[in-house]
């Protein structure tokens, strides 16, 4: 199986330990898929700064293909800053700077590469909602992570990104079945087949076309 993780890459920087780690939803998906034995590829815009080199090195070391990623000269990598407090990370700020690479712009070459995938995974963090219709029109199974923020759970956002999603994933607080059904309803109305809510230690719930 070939998986292409489409979208974001960042550096997580921890101020109080002065450590840097590669991250981003798409990067994490690609790495974990490769570790589980899948043929994994990351597709997203890369800068040419030192932080981008950290991301590239980690992806290569984990067996992830990045050969189709555009490398944008003079552009920088988004940095998410945290402190670690009592073993938990505490968010400080996001630094994009004036030269951030920005979201990937999908052209003919990227579409041709995406056609080779069996599974495409993207997310709200890719910042590519207006490009999702073209991706979902491809033959691959398509999974989309809506994250945890309410701004990605509006009717307007759903209308923009739901054009053939096979699996929608949402990070949620613990809820009962009635609340879960209410969460799923607008997605199922827009043709989403499977909706998965993850609730941390409270477990998960899956809805298949409202069942």
How does the language model describe each region?
Residues 1-4, 58-60, 66-69, 85-210:
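Ribokinase/PfkB-type carbohydrate-kinase core domain
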Residues 2-3, 9-79, 85-86:
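Substrate-binding N-lobe of the ribokinase-like
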